[in-house]
């Protein structure tokens, strides 16, 4: 899904952004109970991102975005940028950002009333719908998949978990509600949201912390 979204956005912003290849390997240790999972440990993934971003810094790039499409990458990616910023702490001209494509503000259920989930899960209504739109031959018997509610009873605390703690089949959410139509709506909505956000990054003044206030982002 992330690759499709990036491709769409790149077509609109090709003269203003440079898109690196999508990384196929991330931190998926929480899925290792399911046969065939390939995962980089969190430290390996951290080191890989550290090296890649430092490469771009050495070439003179100052605005670097890590655009994420997998929940397991969220914490390591944020930590990687934190480490990089501390190593380059005397610089005031860097904008190092990490964002997840479904977390930039869009609320899909406000665009399509039949979308039921209120947050991303795993192989859920949202993801299953997008795969139905892109590669329907990869989708199995989603109509009979049981509901597995997202979230945890201890929110707002962040509970450590493995996928098997939450789901015997590996999905989280309501995949039985997925549809090709919803998938197209979601892909279009997320692509538009990513493009809007990147346009704000492009318009950053080059050294201000409070530039986000000027651009209308919550601080």
Across the structure, where does each feature detected by a protein language model lie?
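Extended, histidine- and acidic-residue-enriched regions that form the cofactor-binding/catalytic faces
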Residues: 1-63, 69-219
